[in-house]
Amino acid sequence: MIQPRFSLTPLALAAGLFAAGHAAAQTVPDTTGQPIQTVVVTASADASAQGLPSDYAGGQVARGGRLGLLGNVDMMDTPFNTTNYTHALIQDQQAKSVADVVQNDPSVRVARGFGNYQELYVIRGFAVNSDDLAYNGLYGLLPRQFVASELLERVEVFRGANSFVNGAAPGGGGIGGMINLLPKRAPNAPLNQVTLGGESSGQVYGAVDIGRRFGPENRAGLRVNAVRREGETAVDAEERELSVFSVGADYRGQGFRVSADAGYQNHKLENARP
């Protein structure tokens, strides 16, 4: 039996090697010229790696906010109705308290409590007492009756089934929604801000806001706020005094974040209109 024999000529062998080399070259990805993604760490009251949701166009509201156990959620991804007011709006409108901020929301009405002078917020027809305001997602940490805006980085208004994601408010309110207040944190750049003001009624105002970051990679931060307001208001014979001091500290570690807040507020109102 005759067995056929096959032999490669030099030309065929060279063509085979060229084809193999060409195929191998296509399997190696080209990594030259690819940009390296830059990770920017920003200071925020939120412990997640992403930090607070970014500002919307104009900077006075944010694109998202905290939804209790769901964490920070973009406004286009949540089944609830939320509005998240930033520190820029607080400064632009010279808001004095939480009431001045939430009055921008058409679904929120502001009143005073029965028999006292606490701020009362009505969301979708249901009352939310100032006792039921949340501070960084937690109840029972804020002063009763009045919260100065100088303590706050953001004011988040949640409208809907509040207890489903945030838990029941201790005061029994919050049926139609809730208000969550976010504390200030030291920014990446040094902050030195002094504000002085006065009103035609005779009330004078002064505030100091200082923020610094320390240590390796600016991991530790400190934010200090001090406020003093005194004098007559726009209401005849009514006088208001306000003293506020707060300190917010935070540390950004490898895979964890730690923060602490301490504050003092003394609000005095004389000859107030009921």
PLM features: what roles do these ranges have?
Residues I36-Q37, V224:
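Short, compositionally biased, intrinsically disordered N-terminal export/targeting signals
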Residues P170-G174, E239-R240, P274:
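Short, glycine/charged-enriched secondary-structure capping and boundary segments
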Residues Q37-A189:
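Acidic, small-polar-rich N-terminal luminal/periplasmic segments of exported/outer-membrane proteins
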Residues A19, P35, N104, P216-N218, ...:
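Short, structurally constrained coil/turn elements
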Residues M1-P35:
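Cleavable N-terminal targeting peptides that direct proteins into the secretory/outer-membrane pathway or into
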Residues L8-H22, A127, D131-Y135, T195-G198:
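Short, charged, low-hydrophobicity "junction" segments
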Residues L142, N166, L196-G197, A234-D236:
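Outer-membrane beta-barrel domain signature
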Residues L191, G198-A272:
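Transmembrane beta-barrel wall of Gram-negative outer-membrane proteins
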